[in-house]
Structures are given as C-alpha cells and as structure tokens.
Swiss-Prot record:
SOCS box domain segment(s): 373-422
Keyword GTP-binding: no
Domain comment, as recorded: The SOCS box domain mediates the interaction with the Elongin BC complex, an adapter module in different E3 ubiquitin ligase complexes.
Pathway entry: Protein modification; protein ubiquitination
GO-annotated biological processes: intracellular signal transduction; negative regulation of epidermal growth factor-activated receptor activity; positive regulation of proteasomal ubiquitin-dependent protein catabolic process; protein ubiquitination
Protein name stated in the entry: Suppressor of cytokine signaling 4
PROSITE patterns, per the entry: SH2, SOCS
Species in which this protein is naturally found: Mus musculus
C-alpha cells in the first residue's frame, strides 16, 4: 500500500505540476521546453493511468501529441526527395543540419526521423566519398564538397590557377568588346543573344570561338548550382551594359568631376570712408600688434578697448578689448561696403563706417556674450605724424581712382592708397577650350 501511495503521489498531481511550471516560466507554452524523452514518458504514464482508472487524457497531453506529430511531418517534409528541389540556401542549411542533427524523439517517433550519423571534417578532407553510393550521406558529402573551398596543401596552386583563369576571361572579354564586327555588341542589333544548354544560337548574328569558350566554361561552373534547362543570357543589345568595369568607373569619375573653367573676378578699390574720423578718435592707436595691446590692457576693467591696425593684410583694423577677465581680439571684416565683426552672418550688426560700428558696441545691452564689449576707450598717449594726418585729410577729399589724377609722385600715390579695401563687383567664367 505504501508503494501504491507513493506512486499515486508521483502521478496524481501531474496537471497541477504543469500549471506550476507555467507559473514559473511565465507563459503557457513552457511545456514545450522539455526534452522529447520526458514528453514520451509523460504520454506513456498518462496512457497507463487511463487504462487503470478510466480517466480521460488531459487536453495538454493531446496538444503535445499533436505537436510531436506536426514536427514529425515537418522533418519528413524536409528530408528525402524534397531535399533535391530546394534552393541553395536551404540545401546548405539541411547539410549543416546533417552534420549537427536535431535530437531525435524516443519511442514511436524515432523511426520517421533521419539517422544520427554525422559527416566529420576528416571525411570531408578525403578525395573519394566514404559512404555507399546513392545514399543520403553520400549525396550530402558531394553537396558539401561542391560548394566549399578545398582545404588542401595545394591550395596555393588552386588559387593561382583560378587567378590565371580570371585573367584569361578578362582578356577574352576585352578582346570581344574591341571587335566591332560582332553583332551581339553592335548598336543595330535589337535582340539579345541567348544560349541554352543544348543549343547555342544568336538571333542577331554568329558567335565567335572565344565567346563559345567563355560560355562553355561558365556552363560547366554553373551546372552545380543551376539545372540544365535554365537559360544563360550572354549579351544584350546595349553596348553600355557590356562595357568592362574599368571603363564604367572612368565614366563615373568623369561625371562626378567638376567642369574645368577659369574665372576672372573684377574688384573695385575704395578708400576707407571715415579715415579722418578714425584718426581723430582717441581710442585709435595706429600700427600695433596684439602683444603690445595685451600689455596695455593688462589689469584694465571690463569693457576697456582700443582700435589698431590689423596685422593681417586682408583686414584693415582690429579691436583689442577686455572681457571675461582677459584680453581678447576681434578683426573688423568688410563685405559689400559694410563693416562688421562677422561679415558672413547677416544677423550680426554691420555699419557703413568704422566709427558707427564702434558706437554700436558701446552699449552692454546691445552686445551678445560672444561679441566684443567696447564701452570704455583706452586713450592714446601719443600724437600721429603730420604725414599721416595729411593723408587722412587728402583721402577724405578724393577717391581711390582720383588719387591717380593728382600731380604727385608715384610713391606718394601708393602711400595715399594704403588704407583701402577691395569689393567684388562681378565674376566672369572663362571656359577652357576643348583639346583636339
């Protein structure tokens, strides 16, 4: 009685045990995680209980039987003669599955599944098939050998032979493209040349010997992957499609390269409009580099600034100012007869003269955090020379082109033109003549 009670205790709570397993795994189909051996044992135990106690088989055991039968049908469907009509990817997957087979069902499900025999790597290294002819393993052995790279001591020779074959094909392709008497590559041919496995005929003309050799080589190589009834298209009516790869790359580079042309830019030269007012401004220090300006601004309060000549030839003036407890510098740029600290940004304030630009940045509320603060000018401690003062007065009364009309020597004219800027007027494009 104790043994019967222990057996009943082990068998009776089977349904409740499955529910608790469902609760642990968190989803209903957790029972499918069990191995095939446990499923078959549970099925046999349920049949024994049904014969002794006349109890119906639970719905869960029926679902497991259906799942086993469906898997059996799927495996039967994937094996056997159906293996021959599948795609290359599916064939490779099935071949790998044969090397690492799926666990077989025990009991009544085992006869319908393939055998556990594996194809080892040592067997794949053999030159001859070690399996009986026309067997399933022999078919898979030949299939893997056809679609894998041979790993042998003579692999270098195989690679060199393959490279020589590729060079020969490239030479044949280049020779075929240069021959204009081939109808397949002419512009007048309107129909493609089609070659089948049984016949080689071109509707637009004949095929040369090199083309036939290329077709036979391709048909021999492709016979492993494609059936004999498939049609191989050799050429089309478009010459552009049959161009070699290097010619197409040259055409793409020519299309992508920008056109070559020369440009002629016309400038107008203008004198600084307010050079006299700048010289009269006490914050203008004339010619000075940034290191001398930093020495003058050292220890000065926030907003102290000075105006000086820029050290770069492309710019006329620069400001050195004190902000964020350090000495900073900003160039004054010119664009379209307007002066600003950033000529490429239309949102930045610009002025037609230098003095108006300095007046704008005196107000701290008008200055952004990245803009110079020019609230307190640093007074110049020396006077300018009489020569410089005379230049400012003359430039205030004439123009850049008007200086050439003045009855003065040429060196003096160059001296008067020193403070000027260039403004772009127009851009002329001069195309390069085509080389004949």
């Amino acid at each position: 009685m104790a043994e019967n009670n222990s057996k009943n205790v082990d068998v009776r709570p089977k349904t409740s045990r499955s529910r608790s397993a469902d609760r642990k795994d968190g989803y209903v189909w957790s029972g499918k995680k069990l191995s095939w051996s446990k499923k078959s044992e549970s099925c046999s135990e349920s049949e024994a209980i049904g014969t002794v106690e006349n109890v119906e088989i639970p719905l869960r055991s029926q679902e497991r039987q259906l799942s086993c039968s469906s898997i059996e049908l799927d495996l039967d469907h994937s094996c056997g003669h159906r293996f021959l009509g599948r795609s290359l990817k599916q064939k490779l997957q099935d071949a790998v599955g044969q090397c690492f087979p799926i666990k077989n069902c025990s009991g009544r499900h085992s006869p319908g599944l393939p055998s556990k025999r594996k194809i080892h790597i040592s067997e794949l290294m053999l030159d001859k098939c070690p399996f009986p002819p026309r067997s399933d393993l022999a078919f898979r052995w030949h299939f893997i050998k056809r679609h894998t790279v041979p790993m042998s001591p003579n692999s270098d020779e195989w690679v060199s032979a393959d490279l020589s074959e590729r060079k020969l094909r490239d030479a044949q392709l280049k020779r075929r493209n240069t021959e204009d008497d081939i109808p397949c590559f002419s512009h007048t041919n309107g129909q493609p040349c089609v070659i089948t496995a049984n016949s080689a005929s071109c509707t637009g003309g004949h095929i040369t010997g090199s083309m036939m050799n290329l077709v036979t080589n391709n048909s021999i190589e492709d016979s492993d992957m494609d059936s004999e009834d498939e049609i191989i298209t050799l050429c089309t009516s478009s010459r552009k499609r049959n161009k070699p790869r290097w010619e197409m790359e040259e055409e793409i580079l020519q299309l992508e390269a920008p056109p070559k042309f020369h440009t002629q830019i016309d400038y107008v030269h203008c004198l600084v409009p307010d050079l006299l007012q700048i010289s009269n401004n006490p914050c203008y220090w004339g010619v000075m580099d940034k290191y001398a300006a930093e020495a003058l601004l050292e220890g000065k309060p926030e907003g102290t600034f000075l105006l000086r000549d820029s050290a770069q030839e492309d710019y006329l003036f620069s400001v050195s100012f004190r902000r964020y407890s350090r000495s900073l510098h900003a160039r004054i740029e010119q664009w379209n007869h307007n002066f600003s600290f950033d000529a490429h940004d239309p949102c930045v304030f610009h002025s037609p003269d230098i003095t108006g630009l300095l007046e704008h940045y005196k107000d701290p509320s008008a200055c952004m955090f990245f803009e110079p603060l020019l609230s307190t000018p640093l007074i110049r401690t020396f006077p300018f020379s009489l020569q410089h003062i005379c230049r400012t007065v003359i430039c205030n009364c004439t123009t850049y082109d008007g200086i050439d009309a003045l009855p003065i020597p040429s060196p003096m004219k160059l001296y008067l033109k020193e403070y000027h800027y260039k403004s772009k007027v127009r851009l002329l494009r001069i195309d390069v003549p085509e080389q004949q």
